[in-house]
Regions:
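Conserved acidic carboxylate
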Residues: 7
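Short hydrophobic/Thr-rich beta-strand motif most characteristic of the beta2 strand and flanking loop
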Residues: 24-38
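Short alpha-helical segment
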Residues: 36-43, 173
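Short loop/edge segments at beta-strand edges and connector loops
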Residues: 37, 103, 168
Length: 177
């Protein structure tokens, strides 16, 4: 499982990352955190999609809420947790189906409980297929895939929203159930 943490304050970012790693260890789930200091960095360097996004609401250029809107255009099933200093922004988080909204300063036990609940939900969610090639790691949920075909060293995944085409072979499929 891949987890994105987008937080511009290094201390908070490190604290959340350690908490996530502890929760992964407790649940026995395999996972990897990737940390970003801005929404732009996540969009540019991140290998989306991620199963879990932990986002700071207030960032310099692109806010966590704007980033979440972008995430929802690509992945309606990801779990999103917001962090912020301002509880009055909580209502906007519901527009992007946020899982939880943490108000800073974040108590370590509260963060731990929220992350544990999020991981349980992810584990209980639907099954998915993962394709891995040199450029990208792509996850497709079973109920979104209409058909998968292989043609001339290319894999074409037909989904509800669009078709994805990339070089690879069917042997690169990892079905996770």
């Amino acid at each position: 499982m891949r987890i994105a943490i987008c937080e511009d304050e290094e201390f908070i970012q490190n604290s959340i990352e350690k908490n996530v790693e502890k929760c992964l260890e407790i649940t026995g789930m395999a996972g990897k955190c990737e940390c970003f200091v801005s929404a732009e960095e996540l969009l540019e360097k991140g290998n989306m999609p991620y199963a879990l996004y932990i986002l700071d609401v207030e960032m310099k250029k692109l806010s966590g809420l704007e980033l979440a809107e972008h995430i929802r255009t690509e992945d309606r099933n990801a779990v999103i947790i917001f962090m912020t200093n301002h509880s009055e922004m909580m209502q906007k988080a519901f527009d992007v189906q946020a899982f939880q909204y943490l108000v800073k300063p974040i108590d370590s036990d509260t963060a731990h409980n929220v992350i544990m609940r999020a991981l349980r939900i992810i584990r209980e969610k639907r099954n998915y297929i993962r394709f891995t090639n040199k450029l990208k790691d792509m996850i497709f949920y079973y109920d979104e895939v209409e058909c998968i075909e292989s043609r001339r060293r290319k894999i074409i995944v037909h989904t509800e929203k669009r078709d994805y085409e990339f070089y690879g072979s069917l042997s690169q499929i990892e079905a996770v159930s």
